[in-house]
Amino acid sequence: MTEAAATILRPRTTEALAGIVAQGRRLEVIGGGTKRGIGRVAGAQSVLSTSALNQVIDYAPEELVLTAQAGVRLADLEVLVAAQGQMLPFEPPHLTQLLRTKGQPTLGGVLAANLSGPRRIRAGAARDHFLGAEAVTGRGEIVKSGGRVVKNVTGYDLCKLLAGSWGTLGVLTQVSLKVLPAARAELTLLYFGLSDAQAGQAMTQALNAPVDVSAAAHVPTATAARAPLKAAMAVTALRLEGFAASVAARAEHLAAALNGLGRCEQLDAGHSRDFWVQIREVEAFSKDPRPLWRISVPPAVGWRVGETIPGDVLYDWGGGLVWLLSDADPAQVRGVVRTLGGYATCYRGDAPAFAPLDGSLAALSARVKAAFDPKGVLNPGRMGAI
């Protein structure tokens, strides 16, 4: 990045932000700056931050809808909705310790990265709760889902496209989200000493049972021994949430169904919440210097990642999300994951964060990029060729 890019531009209105983008300078787009290390922005001339767009526009708890500017801090939103007995359903991770950053993640940043926590397997991904958006395209045009139609982007689902685009298609300035009532009670069942394959089968069985498991994770022995878990053997965890009587009945049903797995312990609500924060934030891997990979795979084959690639792993989403610490060659990591039908993103390390897209997907991405940002001014190079 050039010396000029050291200046961080913090517009206070969407119109001012659009004016900056319309100038055509190449921009590194950030919210709280906590994920700047994921992907490498090449040739940016300035840094554009949404941190000054930090107001809650409207919150109607009775309608389960919240509208806020993109620069609102995620932690502040969580406090706001919790005071009304509600929650962000997709349980967004902060990842500041894992990524070794000092900033505060923002609502826009979490949605731009489409980051979801353990509850994704029950409630859906971040993009599934993204009801509306206002954004500025690379042309400097202000667009809204369900609002003004701009001919160059007509026909696109704005929310679905911007979620996971890492700021390469448009700069989110305002979003509307669905919120849900927070669970009245929760508990977590713990099983010990299972292999990765056994845990994968157990999590699949639990998720297919009529008990509404809201989170399922497996921490192998080598990972469980790390702080903060410090467990002597592998831990497989299954969370249940809801009304107290329902949670208790479902826990009894699930424990009976998994009786063959051996000793089962229960974490009460407080300890359960602490445990899932550790899983959500991948705290066991925060201090290890090795390259870190975030791998999405079909849950039924997730355990094969740890079996095939040397390193330490942690499984979330019933095996569908695998965090991997490994010095293995990036080509090996991506090759194994590709054969499993998944995708690997390098969150820490020297490898490119995002793998190049193949054939028709690359062509489609190029067409979408051309529609939203034809001159490539937004986060150039962050997602590779996109």
Which residues make up each language-model segment?
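N-terminal glycine-rich flavin-associated loop
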Residues: 2-29, 50-103, 111, 115-148, ...
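Short, conserved charged micro-motifs
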Residues: 16-17, 76-77, 196-201, 245-252, ...
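A generic structural signal for well-ordered alpha-helical segments
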Residues: 24-27, 81, 258, 337, ...
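Glycine-rich beta-strand-to-loop/alpha-helix junction loops that act as flexible
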Residues: 29-35
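Residue-level signal for inorganic ion chemistry
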Residues: 31, 238, 324
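Short glycine-biased active-site loop of nucleotidyltransferases that positions the nucleotide triphosphate
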Residues: 36-42, 228-229
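Conserved glycine-rich FAD pyrophosphate-binding loop
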Residues: 41-44, 51, 261-386
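C-terminal substrate-binding/cap subdomain adjacent to the FAD-binding core in PCMH-type
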Residues: 112, 131-289
